[in-house]
Amino acid sequence: MDFKNKKWLFLAPLAGYTDLPFRSVVKKFGVDVTTSEMVSSHSLVYAFDKTSKMLEKSPLEDHFMAQISGSKESVVKEAVEKINALEHVNGIDFNCGCPAPKVANHGNGSGLLKDLNHLVKLLKTIRENTSKKITSVKVRLGFEKKIPKEIAHALNDAPVDYVVVHGRTRSDKYQKDKIDYESIALMKKILKKPVIANGEIDSVKKAFEVLQITQADGLMIGRAALRAPWIFWQIRNNTTKLPAVVKKDLVLEHFDKMVEFYGDMGVIMFRKNLHAYAKGEMQASAFRNCVNTLTEIKSMRESIEEFFNQEMLQSEVPLWVELNQKSV
């Protein structure tokens, strides 16, 4: 990965959302790196056949990272060895930022920020045992209090290719007013490896503001992409205009991929995606209530066609075939 010639754009791993169908849709809008949903090392080791489905990738994904969590060195080592057998995976990202109590309270995710020596030891274990070219880590600014300097200095001893920094502590969770890009900038000054900024990047304007403040080598975007997967295309082209794509067709394509990947269960699983796509639209509440009752492919497809038929996202910006040509 060459960080000298462009700012890289990453899709953040989001549990329950960034599966293969969604990543396939987003990839068409110019995102450089996609990452799996977080997979626990324990699940990889003891339920590999089931868990490995989360690590499948689409033909479009040329830079695909498997994100794992864990705190026990022997289990992390074995999980890495499992991933080695998956030739389509390009690298391993280690989650040290998840704030969920069921993860952090057991010393995983952001819980590792309380023991930086152990965190670095686990990263060394990953690097020593992986056959993949890329190893990365995703962190927050601290657990209860901000310790950006300490984290940055510790990670300088870790064998990683880049560091993703979410600009909040674990205690901050996802509070908007807690985002701190200045601390990411501080870590960028200390770290001797590329830094990717993450957190509350929800527009083109915000993207370039964050790059200016942090001097980061790239951006990772998650929740904003759920409703507007074209945000990566907008950043690439430095425009607030929308690509000329019919939103209905985009949503239907995503739905069809969900059904193809999950079968009939994809109908129910797609409800949460529809909630995101419909956010801010007229009659969105009624639409959400409707789709929450649907379980059949035919009825769900009809509801999607009816609701999104009212809306055409158009502009004079080039079509799909010209996406992914520019870089920031």
UniProtKB/Swiss-Prot annotation:
GO terms for molecular function: flavin adenine dinucleotide binding; tRNA binding; tRNA dihydrouridine synthase activity. This is Probable tRNA-dihydrouridine synthase. Keywords: Flavoprotein, FMN, NADP, Oxidoreductase, RNA-binding, tRNA processing, tRNA-binding. The active site is at C98. The keyword Lipoprotein does not apply. Its EC number is 1.3.1.-. It catalyses: a 5,6-dihydrouridine in tRNA + NAD(+) = a uridine in tRNA + NADH + H(+); a 5,6-dihydrouridine in tRNA + NADP(+) = a uridine in tRNA + NADPH + H(+). The gene is dus. It is an enzyme of class 1 (oxidoreductase). Catalyzes the synthesis of 5,6-dihydrouridine (D), a modified base found in the D-loop of most tRNAs, via the reduction of the C5-C6 double bond in target uridines. It comes from Helicobacter pylori (strain ATCC 700392 / 26695). Belongs to the Dus family. FMN binds at P13, L14, A15, Q67, K138, N198, G199, E200, G222, R223. InterPro entries: Aldolase_TIM, DUS-like_FMN-bd, DUS_fam, tRNA-dHydroUridine_Synthase_C, tRNA_hU_synthase_CS. Gene3D superfamilies: Aldolase class I, Putative flavin oxidoreducatase, domain 2. It comes from the Bacteria. Its cofactor is FMN.
